[in-house]
């Protein structure tokens, strides 16, 4: 019994110590935000804006998928003091033109004021050992260039370190990056954002909402410059 209490006590102490450490590290980043999709449920954006400066809303994936809550989330976010960005998830298996058409049809002019996020991750046979990846890289570059030209906005690439190094940087060496599954710490340019918890939980009105937690990798002044790329 005594041993059990000691183990439980140490566990609680360890958790609280880690929480304090994490909060201290987060305090070094002045700009905080979240990523959301239809799995996040109904969010109060006014409440969200009290502790966050930006929100990225999932819009499309590939050439056919649209997030069910995109329009509703985008519309309601406009009434809050929070900067808004939109997300397209890159598909290796569909053409650039089809993906661009689907994105255009889904979002219209609802692209927010932040750089558009293009999320990239390996799946199935699409990885560094695939001989077709050079062509896939050109497809990604075509999509990024078209988005920048069409919407006159910046584009930030969201991917983990492996995908950024092997796939993204060879074709887009100067593109703004969003480190997926990252850790709070120092990242050199062009990493602009750091996702430190992809499976976060946000408590609102007694409900637990699924979101991704991210910080901007820079100062308030740098954030102002980044957030005005339109």
Positions of predicted regions on the chain:
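Functionally critical loop-and-helix segments that line ligand-binding/catalytic clefts
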Residues: 23, 28-33, 41, 172-230
């Amino acid at each position: 019994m005594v041993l059990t209490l000691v183990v439980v006590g140490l566990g609680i102490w360890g958790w609280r110590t880690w929480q304090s450490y994490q909060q201290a590290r987060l305090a070094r980043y002045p700009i905080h935000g979240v990523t959301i999709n239809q799995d996040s449920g109904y969010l109060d954006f006014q409440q969200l804006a009290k502790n966050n400066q930006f929100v990225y809303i999932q819009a499309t994936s590939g050439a056919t998928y649209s997030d069910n809550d995109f329009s509703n989330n985008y519309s309601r976010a406009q009434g809050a003091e929070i900067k808004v960005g939109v997300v397209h998830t890159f598909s290796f298996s569909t053409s650039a033109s089809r993906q661009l058409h689907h994105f255009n049809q889904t979002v219209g002019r609802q692209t927010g004021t932040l750089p558009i996020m293009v999320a990239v991750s390996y799946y199935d046979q699409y990885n560094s050992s695939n001989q077709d990846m050079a062509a896939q890289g050109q497809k990604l570059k075509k999509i990024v260039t078209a988005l920048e030209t069409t919407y006159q906005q910046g584009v930030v690439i969201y991917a983990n370190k492996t995908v950024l190094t092997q796939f993204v940087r060879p074709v887009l060496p100067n593109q703004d990056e969003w480190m997926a599954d990252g850790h709070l710490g120092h990242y050199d340019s062009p990493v602009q954002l750091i996702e430190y918890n992809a499976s976060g939980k946000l408590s609102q009105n007694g409900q637990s909402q699924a979101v991704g937690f991210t910080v901007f990798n820079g100062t308030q002044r740098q954030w102002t410059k980044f957030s005005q790329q339109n």
